[in-house]
């Protein structure tokens, strides 16, 4: 009797362990796959994908002088944006799906607030690169980002990050507003305003 009971208990424990492994694998798969809202937006023809070679081609990136991986778009990024799409109608808008991965964790189960700040910096910069109506990487730089953190982000979350041009001053200053939110329930996790400064070289090339 005892042997049979022990065997049954061992079998039950093994089944529970197998179920837990399956659940964890399923969660990892769900977390790794872009959400439906992003796939639906991405398929709309008015949204143009940014084609940025240094995000997509690690070998080319290394051979072109970069010494590491992209902080937000690299394969090992703690908060990763696979790509941005943009709409050049006024006001210019940029949208992406941000995956907050395990490496962004600070408080148990929650991501570090700095991960949201880094994301705001990134999308404000890339919105500035698109201000000419086409994506021109490294045609300027972000000089100011004011971020307000509202709601913590749980580890594993996929959130919508978006930005739009608010106004331009002269030929170089571009003021941009951005937001991080959950399209599923409308929760706004943070907002930001930033100043992007277009390079003198970009203006000289006539991309104003």
Predicted regions and their residues:
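Preference for bulky hydrophobic residues occupying beta-strand positions
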Residues: 96-98, 147, 178, 194
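HotDog/MaoC-like acyl-thioester-processing domains
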Residues: 15-61, 153-155, 160, 166-208
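Histidine-centered catalytic micro-motifs
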Residues: 109-115, 147
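Hydrophobic beta-strand-centered segment that forms part of the acyl-chain substrate-binding groove
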Residues: 122-165
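Catalytic strand-loop segment that frames the active site of acyl-thioester-processing enzymes
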Residues: 60-111
């Amino acid at each position: 009797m005892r042997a049979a009971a022990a065997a049954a208990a061992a079998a039950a424990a093994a089944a529970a362990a197998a179920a837990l492994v399956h659940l964890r694998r399923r969660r990892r798969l769900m977390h790794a796959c872009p959400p439906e809202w992003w796939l639906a937006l991405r398929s709309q023809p008015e949204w143009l994908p940014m084609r940025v070679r240094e995000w997509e081609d690690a070998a080319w990136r290394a051979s072109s002088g970069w010494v590491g991986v992209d902080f937000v778009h690299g394969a090992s990024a703690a908060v990763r944006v696979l790509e941005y799409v943009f709409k050049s109608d006024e006001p210019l808008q940029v949208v992406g799906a941000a995956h907050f991965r395990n490496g962004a964790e600070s408080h148990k189960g929650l991501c570090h607030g700095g991960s949201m700040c880094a994301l705001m910096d990134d999308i404000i910069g890339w919105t500035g690169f698109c201000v000419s109506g086409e994506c021109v990487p490294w045609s300027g730089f972000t000089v100011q980002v004011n971020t307000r953190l509202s709601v913590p982000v749980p580890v594993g979350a996929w959130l919508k990050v978006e930005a739009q041009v608010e106004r331009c001053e002269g030929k170089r200053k571009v003021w941009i507003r951005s937001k991080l939110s959950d399209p599923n329930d409308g929760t706004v996790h943070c907002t930001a305003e930033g100043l992007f400064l277009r390079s003198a070289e970009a203006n000289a090339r006539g991309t104003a």
